[in-house]
């Protein structure tokens, strides 16, 4: 996920404050579940995100739509936090706040989030094997896979962690072969 560094700098204190609050009040699991569901909901309902990001829409209207849309699904504290973001004019940072908050939770729980791009959908057994290997490689208690299917990779898969990129794609192998042939044929 490529996010503007300024956005991260502004969103981080909100995520950190909510994280600290959730630990203090012993509601981290509820807020984490809310944010995991909210992350999916916002991706599927781009109209809501656009509405909340619109500077012309009043703060009261934004609070009202959040309450009507999400009150039944969210913990009271999560909803209050969203209202604070609206009141402070920071609701447009919601997706970044969610991402940072979840990273803090996963880091605390020794859960690593790993992006995997694949040419074809993994089977259940392939996912299980991949998770086991990644747990060993990353020294993590749990692995959270974020899988995207990209037919342009031709075959294989690409693994992205915070510090590493491991490329097992056929596309990459073909590019390496082409470079090698270019250097060999130039001689």
UniProtKB/Swiss-Prot annotation:
InterPro entries the UniProt entry points to: ATP_synth_OSCP/delta_N_sf, ATPase_OSCP/dsu
Functional note: F(1)F(0) ATP synthase produces ATP from ADP in the presence of a proton or sodium gradient. F-type ATPases consist of two structural domains, F(1) containing the extramembraneous catalytic core and F(0) containing the membrane proton channel, linked together by a central stalk and a peripheral stalk. During catalysis, ATP synthesis in the catalytic domain of F(1) is coupled via a rotary mechanism of the central stalk subunits to proton translocation. This protein is part of the stalk that links CF(0) to CF(1). It either transmits conformational changes from CF(0) to CF(1) or is implicated in proton conduction.
One GO molecular-function entry: proton-transporting ATP synthase activity, rotational mechanism
KW Membrane (keyword) present: yes
Homology family: Belongs to the ATPase delta chain family.
Subunit structure, as described in the record: F-type ATPases have 2 components, F(1) - the catalytic core - and F(0) - the membrane proton channel. F(1) has five subunits: alpha(3), beta(3), gamma(1), delta(1), epsilon(1). CF(0) has four main subunits: a(1), b(1), b'(1) and c(10-14). The alpha and beta chains form an alternating ring which encloses part of the gamma chain. F(1) is attached to F(0) by a central stalk formed by the gamma and epsilon chains, while a peripheral stalk is formed by the delta, b and b' chains.
Membrane topology note: Peripheral membrane protein
Taxonomy, superkingdom: Eukaryota
GO cellular component, one term: proton-transporting ATP synthase complex
Lineage, broadest ranks: Eukaryota, Sar, Stramenopiles, Ochrophyta, Bacillariophyta
UniProtKB keywords: ATP synthesis, CF(1), Chloroplast, Hydrogen ion transport, Ion transport, Membrane, Plastid, Thylakoid, Transport
Keyword Iron set for record: no
Localization in the cell: Plastid, Chloroplast thylakoid membrane
Name of the protein in its database record: ATP synthase subunit delta, chloroplastic
């Amino acid at each position: 996920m490529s996010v503007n560094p300024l956005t991260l700098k502004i969103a981080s204190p909100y995520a950190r404050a909510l994280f600290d609050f959730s630990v203090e009040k012993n509601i981290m699991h509820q807020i984490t579940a809310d944010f995991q569901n909210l992350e999916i909901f916002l991706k599927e309902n781009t109209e809501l995100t656009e509405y909340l990001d619109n500077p012309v829409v009043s703060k009261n209207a934004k609070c009202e739509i959040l309450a009507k849309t999400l009150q039944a699904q969210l913990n009271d504290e999560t909803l209050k936090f969203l209202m604070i973001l609206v009141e402070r004019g920071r609701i447009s940072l919601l997706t970044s706040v969610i991402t940072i908050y979840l990273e803090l939770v996963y880091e605390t729980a020794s859960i690593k989030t790993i992006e995997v791009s694949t040419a074809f959908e993994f089977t259940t057994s392939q996912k299980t094997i991949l998770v086991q290997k990644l747990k060993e490689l990353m020294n993590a208690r749990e692995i959270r896979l974020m899988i995207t299917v990209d037919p342009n990779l031709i075959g294989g898969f690409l693994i992205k962690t915070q510090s590493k990129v491991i490329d097992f794609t056929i596309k990459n192998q073909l590019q390496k072969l082409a470079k090698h042939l270019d250097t060999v044929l130039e001689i």
